[in-house]
């Protein structure tokens, strides 16, 4: 891949979202299909490839697409509509992808390139197109800090586009809203995970995309239940400034929704304190993930998504150069 390919989508401004911006990742989906390579292997995880034959349980009928098995053509629907339609089947090895996308207050922050919430949407979009290319279903829940929006899993491109439009609307509509109370947000986060549990088909691959600042011990029991019948992945998104990595040397008034203060970024002790706080938070998330045998992956909002997936270096380490 050349440098241009690894840059941001041409329609991205880093703060708000557009449909063209998310559809951009469709062009990159095929290269990440297992078994040749996978997003998870590039993020120091493992993603088992699935070899799928013709399914056994009928799922739905949709218009024929290139690559569909001609033996599955539904001739009755084809004759009635005048357009070829094919039957889709659920297979024993089918693995729907269910995404939990956090676009809450703490995610709407970025010091260099993107808001964390925008990076979350980019990654969710890439996973959605990869899942669609693998002829699996994708859906999920969009969490804005107070409420959730459900999108049932589907293997139709139209449904995936509607899913992305929902992410955009949920993200952009709440961009200027007042910050929520921390206790309220953590409670809503747990409720959103419970909703995911009700929506999720058994045997799904569940991907939680968040900065996990709303994570509490209450969530552990929910994750434990989800992991009994599904495969979970944590994708933790952070910003370089949260880790003390910044070229800014002035004084800035900042808030984390719990407290506000003036910070002197020319001071090495300020940057060190931020780094220590970030490390403590990451350790908390890592510990919960380890206890539940959930894989934890990291992404930075300070770098384009595709450049991180093609690098062997941890995103948090790539950001260190910004100090």
Predicted regions and their residues:
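Exposed, interaction-prone extracellular/peripheral surfaces
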Residues: 2-47, 63-68, 77, 86-99, ...
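Structured adenosyl-cofactor binding patch, chiefly the S-adenosyl-L-methionine
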Residues: 125-128
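A positional/architectural concept
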Residues: 52-55
